[in-house]
Amino acid sequence: MQNVEIIYKNAKVRGILINEANGLITIKADNGYNLTFDRSEVEILSRVTIEEKKEKKTEVESFGTGEKSISILATGGTIASRVDYETGAVKPVSDPRLLFGGTELESKFNIRVVNVMNQLSENMKPADWIHLARKVMDETKHSSGIVVSHGTDTMSYTSSALAFMFERLAQPIIFVGSQRSSDRPSSDTKENMEGAINFAATDLGEVGIAMHKGISDGSIVLHRAVRSRKMHTSRRDAFESIDTVHLAEYTSSVRFFSDYRKAEEENLLLDHLDEKVSIIYFHPGLVASDVENMIEGKHAVVIMGTGLGHIAKDLIPVFKNFTKDGNFAIMTSQCIYGSVDMNVYSTGRELIAAGVISAGDMVPEVAYVKAMFTLGNYGREEFINVFNRNLRGEILNRLIPREVYI
C-alpha cells in the first residue's frame, strides 16, 4: 500500500493509491472519496510505501458473563465484513463484538465465537456444508444453542443442508446474515444477530434463518430453513417463508407463531451428500442436446419447470432415458409459490410416464439439497420412498394464501 501525492490541473491531491493500470490511476483521497484520473494528466510528486497492519486472527474467542452458552460459528459473507475506508476494500471483521456488540447480550449470554472459514457464500460447496456441519456437531458439546453467520446469497442452501444432515437436534441451529456490512450506519448486522442469539436460546430443535421482518428496524423473524428463500437482492427483509408463516419473531423477547420440533436429548448427524445432483432451469428454446450435456454423469436432476411443472415435449425423451438408467428427475416450479401438479395437463402426465418425480410444494433449492442428502445417506434403492417423506417440514400439509403472511 502506498501514500501518494499528485498534481492534477494545478491542484494537489494526497491519499492512498488503490490502483494504477490501463492508463488510469485511482486514489483514496484524504477526504474519503475515491478519485480516478487519466494517468497522462497526473504528475506524481511522491510515493511512500506503508506497511499494512496484520489483523490478529483467533480461532475461538469468548465473551460475556451470562449463564446461557451460545456459540457463533463464523463462515464469512457480508455479516462478517467491513469496509476498509483507507482503501475501499472489503475485509473480514477483526473484532467479533462488531457482530453482536452490546453489553445487554454479553450480560445475558456466554458467547463463544468460532472462526470456521471466511467464504463468500457463492463460493461455498457441498464439502463446505459437511465441514460446517461437523464443526457445529463439535460445538454442541460447549453450547446450548448454535448461531451460524453466513452470506445471504446461498444461506438457504447451506441451512437446508444442515437441516437434513441433523437427523436429531438437541439445540437450535440459527443461521443469520446481513444485507449491509457491520461498519455501515444502516447495517442490519447487530439486530439480526441479537435476534439469532435469542432464538438460539429457546427449546427449538430445528435449523432456522433469522433476518429482518421488514425494511425498518425493530423486529427479527425466524424462518424454517427448509421453507425459506432469499426473495430480494438488497432489502433487509430479503428472506421469506414460502407458502407458510414464519416460525417465530423477536422484538424484546421471542414469540413463536407455528408448531415446531422441540430439542431432543442428543444430536444425530448424517453427514453424507451425493454431489452428482444439479438444477436445470427450463426456458423456451432449451434444446435436448444441451440438457443431455448438463445431466451427463448425474445421479439426480432437479428441473425448475413452468407453472404446475412443465417443460417442452421434445425434452421429455431425454429425461425418460435418464430415469431408465436408474437416475432421478425431480420436478419443481419456477413460480416458487404453490405446488407442482403433473396430473392436470397432458405434458405433466407424459412426464410422470417418463419417470419424473413431483417435488410437490418443495422450494426448488431445498429439493436439490434433499436429493443430495437422500442419495448420500439412503442410496438409490430407498430414494423415492425417503424423498417423498416430509423429513424436516419441507413439505406442507396445506398452502397458506400469500396475503395472510406477507
From Swiss-Prot:
Location of the Asparaginase/glutaminase domain: 68-390
InterPro entries per UniProt: AsnA_fam (IPR006033), Asp/glu_Ase-like_sf (IPR036152), Asparaginase/glutaminase-like (IPR006034), Asparaginase/glutaminase_AS1 (IPR020827), Asparaginase/glutaminase_AS2 (IPR027475), Asparaginase_C (IPR040919), GatD (IPR011878), GatD_N_sf (IPR037222)
Q: What class of enzyme is it?
A: ligase
**Superkingdom of this protein's organism:** Archaea
**Ligase keyword on record:** yes
Q: One GO BP annotation here?
A: regulation of translational fidelity
EC no. given is 6.3.5.-
Catalytic machinery residues? T78, T152, D153, K230
Which of UniProt's keywords are assigned here? ATP-binding, Ligase, Nucleotide-binding, Protein biosynthesis
Q: Does the keyword Protein biosynthesis apply?
A: yes
Q: Which PROSITE patterns match?
A: ASN_GLN_ASE_1, ASN_GLN_ASE_2, ASN_GLN_ASE_3
* Catalysed reactions, as listed in the record: L-glutamyl-tRNA(Gln) + L-glutamine + ATP + H2O = L-glutaminyl-tRNA(Gln) + L-glutamate + ADP + phosphate + H(+)
A Pfam family annotated for this chain is Asparaginase_C
Q: MF terms per GO, please?
A: asparaginase activity; ATP binding; glutaminyl-tRNA synthase (glutamine-hydrolyzing) activity
Q: Tell me which PANTHER family the record gives.
A: 60 KDA LYSOPHOSPHOLIPASE, L-ASPARAGINASE
Q: Function, please? A: Allows the formation of correctly charged Gln-tRNA(Gln) through the transamidation of misacylated Glu-tRNA(Gln) in organisms which lack glutaminyl-tRNA synthetase. The reaction takes place in the presence of glutamine and ATP through an activated gamma-phospho-Glu-tRNA(Gln). The GatDE system is specific for glutamate and does not act on aspartate.
Query: NCBIfam families annotated for this entry?
Result: asnASE_I (TIGR00519), gatD_arch (TIGR02153), PRK04183.1 (NF003217)
Similarity annotation: Belongs to the asparaginase 1 family. GatD subfamily.
Matching HAMAP family:
GatD (MF_00586)
Subunit and partners: Heterodimer of GatD and GatE.
Question: What is the protein's given name?
Answer: Glutamyl-tRNA(Gln) amidotransferase subunit D
Which species is the source of this protein?
A: Thermoplasma volcanium (strain ATCC 51530 / DSM 4299 / JCM 9571 / NBRC 15438 / GSS1)
Taxonomic lineage: Archaea, Methanobacteriati, Thermoplasmatota, Thermoplasmata, Thermoplasmatales
